């Protein structure tokens, strides 16, 4: 179930930079527990899928899982042993641009201990530092 957009306006995009902390998607909105990233990074659809599979296997279909990031940026690459020039390479895979503080996954319907174990396991599948977070109760 590798995530990718159904259709895009432009096939190739410029790289850009990941600057600053997350101002959106930085709160636990849907579930009770979350996995938050602490570093700026481009997460690939395969990395997101690996973390999702690890989470689902750990909770054993017990709770509800939300994936809060979506890979919508194409990553282009030139073939091996190709000389420079002759235009931009073809799109290889899709990445999600995440800033520090972005919520990656949310979970609900399981105990706190199991949720923490599952989130730490999912975080170990990702090449960035992550932390476990809980929803703040509003009064």
Swiss-Prot record:
GO cellular component: cytosolic large ribosomal subunit
GO MF annotation: an example: tRNA binding
Keyword Electron transport in record: no
Keywords noted in UniProt: Ribonucleoprotein, Ribosomal protein, RNA-binding, rRNA-binding, tRNA-binding
InterPro entries according to UniProt: Ribosomal_uL16, Ribosomal_uL16_bact-type, Ribosomal_uL16_CS, Ribosomal_uL16_dom, Ribosomal_uL16_sf
BP GO annotations: translation
Disulfide bonds: none
Function noted in UniProt: Binds 23S rRNA and is also seen to make contacts with the A and possibly P site tRNAs.
Assembly notes: Part of the 50S ribosomal subunit.
Family recorded in the similarity comment: Belongs to the universal ribosomal protein uL16 family.
Protein's recorded name: Large ribosomal subunit protein uL16
Gene: rplP
């Amino acid at each position: 179930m590798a995530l990718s957009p159904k259709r895009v306006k432009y096939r190739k995009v410029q790289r850009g930079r990941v600057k600053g902390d997350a101002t959106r998607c930085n709160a636990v909105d849907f579930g009770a527990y979350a996995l938050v990233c602490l570093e700026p990074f481009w997460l690939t659809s395969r990395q997101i899928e690996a973390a999702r599979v690890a989470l689902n296997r750990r909770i054993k279909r017990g709770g509800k899982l939300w994936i809060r990031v979506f890979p919508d940026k194409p990553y282009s690459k030139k073939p091996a042993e190709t000389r420079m020039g002759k235009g931009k390479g073809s799109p290889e895979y899709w990445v999600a641009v995440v800033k520090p503080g972005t919520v990656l996954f949310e979970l609900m319907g399981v105990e706190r201990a199991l949720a923490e174990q599952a989130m730490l396991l999912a975080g170990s599948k990702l090449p960035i530092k992550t932390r476990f977070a809980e929803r703040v109760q509003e009064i």
